[in-house]
Amino acid sequence: MIKSIILQAIMVLSTLTSVHGANSSGCGKQPTLVNGVHKINDREYILKVPDNYNANKPHHLIFGLHWRGGNMNSVVNGESVEPWYGLETRAQGSAILVAPNGRNAGWANINGEDVALIDAIIKQVEDDLCIDQSSRFATGFSWGGGMSYALACARAKEFRAVSVLSGGVISGCEGGHDPIAYLGIHGISDPVLPFDGGVTLANKFAANNGCQQTYVGKPGLGSHSSVQTDFKGCSRPVSFIAYDGGHDAAPLGVGNPLAPDATWKFFMAA
């Protein structure tokens, strides 16, 4: 079973194009994939294609990864967050979005099986739809943040950027030596995945990206505010936003634009 997962991952990865690549083979095709649930191997995901989809226009590809105890519907419907982490509305038809389902309501990524799932979804989607292969992104909260971090480690050459919301090293970090644009967003009073751990994740990619060592600022306790730190001298951008709060899927409250705005802006500038 383990050998099969690894072999499948190697075969799929060999077909993926790096962030320096061109447009996907789905460009110019009449698509067969439609909005809704799709199955791949023994897993599933929800796909959202823009209403004004143009098969000749390359789109961003954005993965929204759910938290522990959630599922793909939690991301799509916006349970405790804006739907699609607020990125669908900000994309204004420029992105195709994917919400995969984790195993057992999480992303343990045993033997890399969840990274292999993402690889397989990318291939299936890009074979059918028009994607700018230099414009793949991932974001998620808590365990979804941990899975986004795992993708930054294992697939830095395939993804342009990740946004890790209150994440930790809970889905592994195979590889983890290559540069990738990295945004971390973390509550200073997080009781589940501590704030200092979130800073450590960002510092790892600051080192990979050749950034200067930087002090990460924090807002005052009870200020209901945030402080953004942008690392300097980086080959790929690294930023970290500390906010006054705990382990929150929607930093500073549901409907607050902090995380969606920062994530979208970071992705588009990466």
Swiss-Prot record:
InterPro entries with a match to the protein in the record: AB_hydrolase_fold, FaeB/C/D, PLipase/COase/thioEstase
Signal peptide from the UniProt entry: 1-21
Localization annotation: Secreted
Chief location of this protein within or outside the cell: secreted
Positions of glycan attachment: N23
GO biological process, one term: xylan catabolic process
UniProt-listed Enzyme Commission number(s): 3.1.1.73
Keywords, in A-Z order: Carbohydrate metabolism, Glycoprotein, Hydrolase, Polysaccharide degradation, Secreted, Signal, Xylan degradation
Entry GO terms, CC: extracellular region
Keyword Ribosomal protein carried by entry: no
GO terms, molecular function: feruloyl esterase activity
Keyword field contains Hydrolase: yes
Similarity comment: family membership: Belongs to the faeC family.
Purpose of the protein: Involved in degradation of plant cell walls. Hydrolyzes the feruloyl-arabinose ester bond in arabinoxylans, and the feruloyl-galactose ester bond in pectin. Active against paranitrophenyl-acetate, methyl ferulate and wheat arabinoxylan.
PANTHER family membership: FERULOYL ESTERASE C, PTHR38050
Protein name per its UniProtKB record: Probable feruloyl esterase C
